[in-house]
């Protein structure tokens, strides 16, 4: 699994189901394949399968989650 950081969190109203929905709908990754999700105040972290990481990064960068444009990167 690869942990990805998303530039929106609880302050923007992001919930785990929003992240799962965005990844499943925009990137074609099945929800059951998505790992742990951690929502912080201004960012969120999600684990995705290593083979899907590039697809998630390119598929969601600049897209909106809960009406907020997001940036994604591999978390350190």
Residue ranges and their predicted role:
Residues 1-76:
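Terminal-proximal interaction/regulatory segments of ATP-powered molecular machines
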